Amino acid sequence: MLHCIQTIVAMINGYMNKIAWVDLSEKKIEYHEVDEDEALKFIGGRGLGGRILVKNCVGKDPLSPENLLAVMTGPLTGSDVPMANRIVAVTRSPLTGAFADSHCGGYAGPALKLAGFDGIVLTGASEEPVYLVAKNGELSIEDAKGLWGKTTFDAYQSIRRKYGATAVFYGIGPAGENLVRFANIMHFSRFATGGRASGRCGTGAVMGSKKVKCLVFLADMKRKPKPADKEGFKKALADALTKIKESDITGPGKGGLSVYGTGVLVNTINELAAFPTRNAKETQFEDAYYISGENLKGTILKKTPTCYKCPVACKRDVEVKEGKFKHKSEGPEYETLWSLGAMIGLGHVEAVAYLNYLANLYGLDTIELGNTLAVATEASEMGLIEEKIRWGDADKYAELVRKLIYREEEIGDLLAEGGAAAAEKLGVPEISMSVKKLSIPAYDPRGLKGMGLTYATSNRGACHLRAYAVSSEVFGVPYKTDPLSYDGKVDVVITLERLFAFVDSLNLCKFSTFALSKENYVVLYSTFTGVEITEDDLEKIGERIWTQERYFNQLHGFSRKDDVLPKRFFEEPSAKGEVYDRDAFERMLDEYYEKHKYNSDGTIPEETLRELGIL
């Protein structure tokens, strides 16, 4: 029996009060109201989706019909709040076996909300390919046999021709259909013509296992949610916009994100010797400038689109006009410039952009893809696979991408399982730069000590978006800390993981945290929903959401033994002679568990779970 959130949200503004539960095995759809108590405790998005997962998916195989995929919005989604444009897919990851939430910008979140839903929960599995259409508070299941096998972009074009230019696509490519364990979910719309991605954790494989090609959202602006406190919200909105516009990071036309996109970080992180290169055997890339945001702007940049209600416009659309890398697509973000650049020794921005284009076209997580190719290259150097793969060989990497998408040959099937599984099968798990089988992003913890604790304790594996310690270590937000010091990093990580859990459950872009304070989020939420909360409430909600996710992992056997880092970071020095100190790492874990009220083995005592209202 599925435990659905059923009690009506009668007094909280910002909800459509409708979550569609789809039994794909039986082709049945039920509509459930949103429980007010759950909404107050877990908000929406990542938090409410996580609640659904904890109640229904413990012990379920990630690629079985019993697993579910919850596609969720938050109470501010679709409103005038700047950067409240995200959508999130929540499930149990087929890549890691752990909690998974994968976020996407653009317009998919607002479109789902304006189609009349707070979320759609997919259960069971269809025997034949289908897609779902959300419109005016109703959901229909449609035949997708004509879409199955198409790339993400071709599938979107088919949907657009059938439903019109305003149709919003959120779906998978051949990688998801073929159950590649790091397949993503791609989004296309008039606000995301080049594409956006729910990239991490293999959510696209879960959608593919259910034989769902895509969700289609047909929005109605008449459904746009309005604030409970009109005048209070107007002031809160003005304050937030002023801060975003005045920030050196987010300011339109002047902030680094606006002028150069996320690629502005490439040179900065490289100079810190924190830019993992050639599978993190090195920490500085000699060709970093050529894959930087500065060089991208001067070479292949075509336009700088923005997501719905976002003044920052950090996105880059690119075009390579001729040659073997000819294409037009959403440009590579910082993480992709690194993962398909430095991590595999490739310093050619046109080639990096082309590999990114292939990933978007076929539906792959670019971070996991780059790490997986890095594992393959190092394994080739070690003579463990027959394929001859050299660092920086763009043509060979493009060939491998196509093979793994369709699981062609032994090498394609091996790499489709992800970098950690591939390394383990080859007998060298130590060459996978991963935590809980999720590969690292573009920050080497040897040069950014806070990121080591972030990766190790993250509920979804090595992830920079659980608690972006770089924010403190590089940007001084919310306060400055020394990148090479271990002191104070536990407090930084806990502060950010709670803030990010709250922001993710509102479904706001986390780039807003570079400019906005906790007070801003509290006032925006309070004036819009009509529910008065304090900064202490924000902290408690974030702690509850975070701990709920860790509890889900605990129920699947995760504990301190999984809060680890690849041994390369402990044993092999960076370009500046830095390693990650094991004793300092263990001390930080002890402090982290103590401040969270966990047991020393990283498990959560029942008392803590009850105190937070999780049990």
Outline where the language-model segments fall.
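Short, Lys/Arg-enriched N-terminal segments with co-localized hydrophobic residues
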Residues: 1-10
